[in-house]
Amino acid sequence: MNILLPTDVFPPHCGGAGWSAHALALALIARGHTVTAIVPREGQEGIHTGETFSVPTVFVGYRAPRIPFVRNYARNERLWIHLARTIAMLSTDRSLHRAPVVIHAQHVQVAPAAVMAGLRVGAPVIISVRDHWPWDYFATGLHGDRIPYPRQTWASLATDLPARLGPLRGAVALPAIPYMLAHLAWRRAALRQASAVIAGSRYIADRLRELVEPDRLHVIPNIVDLTAIDAITATPPTSVPLDEPFVLFIGKLERNKGAHLLCDIVHAACDALQRHTLVIAGTGPLKHDLEQAMHTTQVRARFLDWIDHDEALRLMAHCDLLLFPSAWGEPLSRVLLEACACRTPVLAMPTGGTPDIIVDGENGALATTVPAFVHRMVELINQPEKRRALGVEARHRAERRFAPGVVAAQLETLYQSLLR
């Protein structure tokens, strides 16, 4: 098959969704398919070809002003027409492709354009949903970036914008609400017109059921490349001394990632952490609060800010425990998938799709409250054999559920069913 992967997030400068798209591309290439990533590139002009870590890539240039909401229109509605034309051109270029074409959109910015192109050339279109973009303009599913809520409406946006942007900027943004709601309608329309929609977890699938009929909705997890991770983690991390035992937190220092809960956890578990350093790999608005918590409790801490992806993997492979106190509806955390591949003992809060990865007491530990989290953390810090056993089983689960061959086979079956 010839598989076109439009994606607005792609390595090297991206988060988990971009790396998931790249892992999918490599897995499909390894199984003999022709794969081309199609990536919008702000600030460029025209169309350029290249390669991104062994994945053939077509970059589609566009420009967007820095004016709020006008910028979003330029990055989406105005871009979709040009991007759809490019996708359609690539799907019908027989000098490049001779087998049947499948268009698999990887994220929100490209999904409507993929549907437009698919309708134009008669190719099946699949859309992967990896976060909350179908029902939340900001894709977090959090009102004011703090409180989970089901969907955005006039009333919710009127309070969300001031909570998110501040009173003055929020008030100035209120006239943009009609555009925001219309933009959400475009996103949902793309999902309704797609040949199939893939949810990365049961949690996201449940959220999508009101938008997508059951026969078009499929739960297929993201891929984690075990072989590549093994090669990377064969080298120790450079940001922490080899003889220093440490507990690890990786992520944005924001409320949705549970950074505010980490302050409470450190206060309650400071005695248990005396033999360990708490390594915090990430940055964000709550960094100062965490620094104050470390100073008050006298817990040894290393703030690494942002680190490259390989170093993050090496840290996970060598830490005694990964803390994941996420406070939002995690779609399917790439950090947790990669932690399983690294045999990392994980302590997490069971939000969103996390239970699809971590089974409490089998390949990790789950705790629903801060006191319960602290209790399990103290237990695991004092039980190295238990930690090792959880890490071994985590790797086994990654091999059974998230390995490239396992997930790519599920996608092949779906693609073939749509081409019949």
PLM regions: where:
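Nucleotide-activated donor-binding/catalytic signature segment of Leloir-type glycosyltransferases, i.e.
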Residues: D289-D310
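A conserved mid-protein helix/loop that constitutes part of the nucleotide-sugar donor-binding site
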Residues: W19, A23, P245, F249-A268, ...
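Membrane-proximal helix-turn-helix segments that form the acceptor-binding/catalytic region
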Residues: W133, Y149-A196
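Short hydrophobic beta-strand element within catalytic cores of glycosyltransferases
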Residues: L321, P345-A348
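A short, well-ordered alpha-helix in the C-terminal region of glycosyltransferases
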Residues: K386-R401, V407-T413
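Carbohydrate-associated surface elements
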Residues: Y203, I223
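Conserved acidic donor-binding segment of nucleotide-sugar-dependent glycosyltransferases
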Residues: D360-P371, E379-E385
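Short His-centered aromatic/hydrophobic patch
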Residues: A105-V110
